[in-house]
Amino acid sequence: MKPEIMCIMLVDDNKNDNFFHEREIKKTHLETYVIPKESGAEALEYLNSMIESGNTKPTLIFLDINMPGMDGWGFLDEYSKLDKDIQSGIIVVMLTTSDNPETKVRAMSWSSVSDYITKPLTKEIMEDLVDKYFKF
């Protein structure tokens, strides 16, 4: 069942990409709450503090691969160590400029990764992902 309000986390060091992708998400007219994070470390900090802080749990995480500091691979490594209750119900989608087949295979080898798409995220791609992973 699709959640009434989708909480979507955008993990990308590029503020312009986050702005553009948030705008495309809003075009779907879904009830969404978007949380932009500029690094894997920021995203993990948010996820780790959800219980104490009352932060909204994301239902969908769009994760870039190439970021300074903790990149997407580092995020996935640390994410896999999180409590299963935190991971439960979260769909992780790699959102990257890389169309390298080897990169896609590597990403999809992570059990926590549900999908892999190349930038840019569009309204149509977002709607397809919602139809694929969240049923009304």
Question: Where are these predicted regions, by residue range?
Answer:
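Non-catalytic signal-transmission and effector/linker regions of two-component phosphorelay proteins
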Residues: 1-9, 16-22, 27-30, 121-136
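Conserved active-site segment of CheY-like receiver
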Residues: 13, 93-99, 120
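Active-site residues of response regulator receiver
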Residues: 63-64
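Helix N-cap/capping motif at the beta->alpha junctions
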Residues: 36-49, 72
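Receiver (REC) domain active-site loop signature in two-component systems and cognate sites
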Residues: 67
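Short amphipathic alpha-helix used as the core "switch/output" element in two-component signaling
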Residues: 73-86
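His-Asp phosphorelay/catalytic-motif detector in bacterial-type signaling
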Residues: 4-5, 30-31, 56-60, 85-91
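Alpha4 helix (beta4-alpha4-beta5 surface) of REC/receiver domains from two-component response regulators
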Residues: 74, 89-90, 98-115, 128
